[in-house]
Curated annotation (Swiss-Prot):
Gene3D superfamilies, per the entry: 3.10.50.40, Trigger factor ribosome-binding domain, Trigger factor, C-terminal domain
EC number: 5.2.1.8
SUPFAM superfamilies: FKBP-like, Triger factor/SurA peptide-binding domain-like, Trigger factor ribosome-binding domain
UniProt entry tagged with the keyword ATP-binding: no
Catalytic activity of the protein: [protein]-peptidylproline (omega=180) = [protein]-peptidylproline (omega=0)
One GO process term, biological-process aspect: cell division
Family per similarity comment: Belongs to the FKBP-type PPIase family. Tig subfamily.
UniProt GO molecular function: peptidyl-prolyl cis-trans isomerase activity
Function, in words: Involved in protein export. Acts as a chaperone by maintaining the newly synthesized protein in an open conformation. Functions as a peptidyl-prolyl cis-trans isomerase.
Protein's recorded name: Trigger factor
Top-rank taxon: Bacteria
Domain notes: Consists of 3 domains; the N-terminus binds the ribosome, the middle domain has PPIase activity, while the C-terminus has intrinsic chaperone activity on its own.
Length: 443
């Protein structure tokens, strides 16, 4: 076997690989010898079929396998000897297309190598950790929000008109073209005006109604309505108003606490404080992580594989286009060109991705089975009733596993770096933390 370098520019590599006919023949014979003990053929005992006959019968079939294995072996040996790591799957092409049995096999292999990653002294990285305490005002605000969610309704004075936010208890019958339709009627139905729980335009027409009043509400079902026989059609709902009720906030006391699973109000406040501080810590970590990535990005410089940058830039452009065009759910659109800004962001992401991968490998950072299981379960909760199917899907899908593993690995590498960096704490207000978070999104 002969390997000759044809290209070595930056990270681009090219090689010609020649596998001699004799090597191929030896590989075929090797595979025949391996299979011989199990082969049965009429006129011969099992395992006693002559090699010449086996080669005549199976040689042609094994030649393709032998060729692929020999080329794969040559590539693996090249990467082992050179230390190169291809950024993407190498491009391999047979150059003697008129090849016939008995000829040498000539193959051209090209790829982009991953760059050498420079050493990073993490002890001189300075980071700021923002600390926010859950003060009484924040706890009281959270309690007030809980009280609103636990609000009740009490009947308004007789003759009062319904306002936005009121609850209207009613019977209604819906008709399309004068005919009642299935699912279009109900009795004693409590509807909170402004909740947007009914189709657009329905609740607005009930603002101002009184108890014991009857009102016809005319609406048009959305074109994308779930029930196809109603989509886009006009309907008239005859509503008989039984009660108009105003919202009453729940009292902030031990009874409210018990509704949310706490023993008393003091215990609920303690739970809220813990939850708030966990939220603040998560936000603070996001800000510090950005600071760390900025510091690393400024600290290192190395060549980047153009193919990785190009793929990442296209992915960024595609994602941003869909965010700006949320009504398009499929990929049935023209090609989205990556801009210079997309490419600049892609270079940063690729550079940091390669650096973190290298640092994680050197630190022997691993994602445990328990961490993967937790991540899969977290994703599975988005598909109620289909958790088992989702779990099985992930187990059979290496690409999905990698999508779940990557952010866990990155966070563990970040923790590893932070543990060695110089970290100073700075206590700030909740509002200042929010501003720091918003600044991340604005960048």
């Amino acid at each position: 076997m002969q390997v000759t370098e044809t290209l070595n520019e930056g990270l681009k590599r090219g090689y010609n690989i020649v596998v001699s006919a004799a090597e191929l023949d030896a590989k075929v014979n090797e595979k025949l010898v391996e299979a011989q003990p199990e082969i049965e053929m009429k006129g011969f005992r099992k395992g006693k079929v002559p090699m010449a006959l086996l080669k005549k019968q199976f040689g042609q079939r094994l030649l393709g396998e032998a060729m692929q294995e020999t080329i794969d072996g040559a590539m693996n040996k090249h990467f082992e000897d050179s230390g190169d790591r291809p950024a993407l799957q190498p491009e391999v092409k047979m150059t003697n297309e008129d090849w016939k049995e008995g000829d040498d096999v000539e193959v051209a292999m090209s790829y982009e190598a991953l760059p050498a990653i420079p050493e990073v002294d993490m002890s001189d990285i300075a980071l700021e950790k923002l600390v926010v305490k859950a003060d009484d005002a924040a706890i009281d605000e959270a309690l007030g929000n809980l009280a609103e969610t636990a609000q009740d309704f009490k009947a308004r004075r007789k003759g009062s008109k319904a306002k936005d936010g009121d609850q209207v208890v009613m019977d209604f019958v819906g008709k399309v073209d004068g005919e009642a339709f299935e699912g279009g009627s109900a009795e004693d139905y409590p509807l909170v005006l402004g909740s947007n729980s009914f189709i657009p335009g329905f609740e607005e027409q009930l603002v101002g109604v009184k108890a014991e009043e009857e009102k016809d509400v005319t609406v048009t079902f959305p074109e994308e309505y779930g029930a196809e026989h109603l989509a886009g059609k006009e309907a008239v709902f005859t509503c008989t108003i039984k009660e108009v009720k105003e919202p009453v906030a729940a009292e902030i006391d031990d009874e409210l606490a018990k509704k949310f699973g706490a023993e008393d109000l003091a215990a609920l406040k303690s739970q809220i404080a813990e939850r708030l501080e966990a939220e603040y810590a998560g936000a603070s970590r996001a800000v510090m992580k950005r600071g760390l990535l900025d510091a690393l990005d400024a600290k290192v410089s190395f060549d980047l594989p153009p193919s990785l940058v190009d793929a990442e830039a296209k992915q960024i452009a595609h994602q941003l286009w869909h965010e700006e065009n949320p009504e398009v759910h499929d990929h049935n659109h023209g090609e989205i060109e990556a801009t210079e800004e997309h490419t600049k962001l892609a270079e940063r992401r690729v550079r940091l991705g390669l650096l973190l991968a290298e640092l994680g490998q050197k630190a022997e950072v691993e994602v445990t089975d328990a961490e993967m299981t937790q991540a899969i379960l977290g994703q599975a909760r988005q598909y109620p009733g289909q958790e088992r199917q989702f779990f099985e899907f992930v187990q059979k899908n290496p690409q999905m596993q990698q999508q779940l593993r990557a952010p866990i690995f990155e966070d563990k590498v970040v923790d590893h770096i932070v543990a060695q960096a110089k970290v100073t704490e700075k206590e700030i207000s909740k509002d200042d933390l929010q501003k720091a978070l918003e600044a991340l999104d604005a960048e």
